[in-house]
Design a protein with these regions (language model features):
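Hydrophobic anchor residue at the start of the ABC signature
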Residues: 54, 98
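Conserved D-loop/post-Walker B switch-helix segment of ABC ATPase nucleotide-binding domains
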Residues: 72-85
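A residue-level structural signal marking coil residues immediately N-terminal to beta-strands
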Residues: 62-63, 93
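ABC ATPase nucleotide-binding domain helical subdomain, centered on the C-loop/LSGGQ "ABC signature"
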Residues: 1-39, 83-84, 92
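Structural motif
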Residues: 66-68, 96
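C-terminal portion of ABC ATPase nucleotide-binding domains
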Residues: 20, 28, 84, 92, ...
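ABC-fold ATPase nucleotide-binding domain signature/coupling loops
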Residues: 23-52, 63, 70, 74, ...
């Protein structure tokens, strides 16, 4: 986290790690925040590594965050919670989120659904989660597919 914010306090670090879904995990480490993970953090899971990178991004002063699949390597329920918490917790900056977890987008201000036409990407639908459920067959279908695969 100090890579992104050199003067970060322990309290700020814990808050960011909590936002990234790692609060309980850090508390269980032998030395808490002072635990050395080693080069490349190879001793931790892919999901934990991904969430550490997310906490680092949250520590940065950037006014816009571009997050590509922040819930990757997590089970569906944890991914949904993580994305929802991110969207609700950070009002100081814009978050552009690329995800296949449509169910996690209920609290997003705006959702842009992309599709392919003749090998080119295009916008299929745009609006809030609830608007798209009501007006976009593609969005409703994709969400139903996601929910059935989660069961």
């Amino acid at each position: 986290l100090r890579v992104a914010k050199g003067d970060i306090t322990a309290e700020q670090a814990y808050e960011l790690l909590e936002q990234a879904g790692l609060g309980a995990w850090v508390s269980q480490l032998p030395k808490g925040l002072d635990t050395v993970l080693g080069s490349g953090a190879t001793s931790i899971s892919g999901g934990e590594r991904r969430r550490l990178l997310l906490a680092r991004a949250l520590a940065s002063p950037a006014r816009i965050l571009l997050l590509d699949e922040p819930g990757e390597h997590l089970d569906p329920a944890t991914a949904d919670t993580l994305i929802t918490d991110l969207l609700q917790a950070d009002s100081k900056r814009a978050i552009v989120l690329v995800t296949h977890r449509l169910s996690a987008l209920a609290s997003a201000d705006e959702v842009v659904l992309l599709g392919k036409e003749n090998q080119s990407a295009r916008i299929i639908a745009r609006g809030s989660h609830s608007q798209l459920l009501a007006t976009s067959n593609e969005y409703a279908w994709a969400l139903a597919q996601e929910e059935s695969s989660d069961e």
